[in-house]
Amino acid sequence: PSQQGYDRAITVFSPDGRLYQVEYAIETVKRGSVAIGIKSKDGIIIMAEEKQRKLQISENPQKLFQIDHHVGAAAAGYIPDARSQVDDAVFFSQSNKLVYDESVSIETVAKHLADQCQQFTQYAGARPMGVAMIIGGVDKNGNLLFLTDPSGTYISYDAVAIGANSDKATEFLDKEYKDDISLEDAGVLGAAAIYLASDVKDGTDHIKMCQIKSDTKQFELISDEQIAKFAHAAKEK
């Protein structure tokens, strides 16, 4: 096939201007379970689907991460790459605090992770990051939500979905999202979007959520009981 010589080397563009290895990495994201971020008038809510095996013991979410006291993240794709990016982001955030004596901005974290992804698109001997990250939080600029992908792109959103069947969730969010949505209604909206994208239509064991409220600027995991309330309200809509 004509593309064969171009999809083996990450540093070589095809004649039609494509980097096949980067495109394959983006396909990896599409195979991951769905993750969603929503900006509300009083905070940010981030959630992810985490399917668990019957005998699996999991005390902490595997696809939700705390980067700083005011910054959270969710991942879709190759999760070990996400852990590597989060570790780097945590170190970057702490270094920023030491150097500038202020909390890092949400966009600065998103740009840093996007820059890291971009580096892995231009050097031979390394593969692209196989993960997309939703970065959200509250800083002096307000409530902010960003998406990074394996190409090194980062974009700000009001609401975003990534992972398997994210097109269904995105279409739903496009239709139902409102600028003045409350944090609680955002939780209900996100739960409804996850049910649309997931093949699991009952229960909430597969849904994990976190939030950063505007008034506290503190990352916190949402309890299973509260997630169940969101899910119940979502099914009544």
List the predicted regions and their residue ranges:
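Long, low-complexity N-terminal extensions
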Residues: 1-237
